[in-house]
C-alpha cells in the first residue's frame, strides 16, 4: 500500500474464500507469534519451532481446506483493505444455531504429539474445552476461536472492525458470544461491551515454564436487547430473547489465544485423518 493511502484505508469484513486460505493462515500465524502469551502456547502445542516451517504451513492450509468441506457451523472471515484488498486481519468462529449433542462436543486431545509433550499440551488445551463445556454444554452460542491482526496493519481499526462484526452477529442471531482473551487484548473487548466471567482458567507456571501462573480472561457479550446478564441467561437455561420491533443493530464498521489453539488442533487432526 502506498503511504499516502494509509489514512484513507477502511477495513472491510468479508467471508474468506478458498483462495484466501493461505493469506488468512499467514495473518493469524504472524499475529500469534507477535503476542507473548500466544507465542508461549505455540511452543507447547508445536514444540521445536515447527510452525515456522514451510511444510507445516502447507499441511495446515491443506488441513484447513479439508476441514472446510465438512464443517457446517464454523466460519472464517477476512478483514481487507478497501483499496487494495490486502488481508489485514481474520476472525474464526463457531456460530451454533442449533443445540449440539455430547458426541459433537467431545475433546479429542492432541493426536500429533506423544509422551510428555502430549501430556503438557493437553494440560493447556484441555481446561479450555472443559470450561466451554461447563458454561454452555450443548446450548446455542457463538464461540470465537480467533481474532487476529497482522502486525503490519495494527492500529488501523482492523481488530475493532472484526469485533464489531462479531457483535453484529451476536445481535442478529440473539446468541451470547464467548471467547478466551489474553491479558493484552482484554481492555479492547471490555471497551466494546464484553464482560469478564467469574469462572477462571489458570495455567500453572510448572506447565508453561514461566515464573508465575497465567490467568486466561474468559469473556462474554450478550445480545444488546437481552437485558440480562450471562449468569442470569445461564440460570434460565439459555432462553430465546424477544427482539424489539425496531431493534437498533450495529452494522460492522487482536489474537484470542485459547480458541485459536483449539482451532489449530481441529485442523491438524483433520489433516492427519484425511
Feature roles, as predicted:
Residues 75-78, 217:
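Hydrophobic beta-strand residues of extracellular immunoglobulin-like
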Residues 35-63:
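Conserved GNAT-fold acetyl-CoA-binding loop/helix
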Residues 160, 172-174, 183-203:
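Conserved active-site alpha-helix within GNAT-family acetyltransferase domains
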Residues 16, 147-149, 185:
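Hydrophobic adenine-recognition pocket in adenosine-nucleotide-binding enzymes
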Residues 146-149, 155-168:
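Conserved acetyl-CoA-binding loop-helix of GNAT-fold acetyltransferases
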Residues 12-26, 32-39:
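A short beta-loop-alpha structural element at the N-terminal edge
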Residues 140-142, 169-182:
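Conserved GNAT acetyl-CoA-binding A-motif
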Residues 39, 51, 55, 67-73, ...:
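Conserved acyl-donor/pantetheine-binding loop and adjacent beta-alpha core of acyl/acetyltransferases
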Amino acid at each position: 500500500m502506498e503511504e499516502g493511502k494509509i489514512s484513507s484505508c477502511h477495513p472491510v469484513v468479508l467471508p474468506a474464500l478458498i483462495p484466501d486460505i493461505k493469506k488468512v493462515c499467514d495473518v493469524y500465524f504472524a499475529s500469534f507469534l507477535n503476542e507473548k502469551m500466544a507465542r508461549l502456547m505455540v511452543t507447547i502445542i508445536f514444540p521445536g519451532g515447527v510452525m515456522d516451517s514451510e511444510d507445516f504451513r502447507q499441511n495446515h492450509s491443506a488441513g484447513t481446506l479439508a476441514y472446510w468441506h465438512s464443517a457446517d457451523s464454523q466460519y472464517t472471515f477476512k478483514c481487507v483493505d478497501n483499496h487494495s484488498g490486502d488481508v489485514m486481519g481474520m476472525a474464526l468462529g463457531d456460530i451454533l444455531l442449533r443445540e449440539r449433542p455430547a458426541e459433537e462436543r467431545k475433546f479429542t486431545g492432541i493426536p500429533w504429539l506423544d509422551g510428555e509433550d502430549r501430556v503438557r499440551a493437553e494440560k493447556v488445551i484441555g481446561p479450555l474445552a472443559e470450561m466451554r463445556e461447563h458454561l454452555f454444554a450443548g446450548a446455542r452460542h457463538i464461540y470465537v476461536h480467533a481474532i487476529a491482526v497482522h502486525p503490519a496493519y495494527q492500529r488501523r481499526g482492523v481488530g475493532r472492525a472484526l469485533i464489531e462484526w462479531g457483535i453484529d452477529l451476536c445481535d442478529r442471531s440473539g446468541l451470547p458470544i464467548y471467547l478466551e482473551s489474553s491479558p493484552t487484548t482484554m481492555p479492547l473487548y471490555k471497551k466494546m461491551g464484553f464482560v469478564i466471567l467469574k469462572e477462571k482458567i489458570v495455567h500453572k507456571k510448572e506447565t508453561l515454564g514461566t515464573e508465575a501462573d497465567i490467568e486466561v480472561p474468559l469473556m462474554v457479550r450478550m445480545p444488546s436487547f437481552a437485558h440480562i446478564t450471562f449468569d442470569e441467561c445461564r440460570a434460565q437455561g439459555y432462553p430465546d430473547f424477544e427482539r424489539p420491533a425496531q431493534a437498533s443493530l450495529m452494522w460492522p464498521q487482536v489474537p484470542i489465544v485459547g480458541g485459536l489453539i483449539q482451532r489449530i488442533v481441529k485442523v491438524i487432526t483433520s489433516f492427519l485423518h484425511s
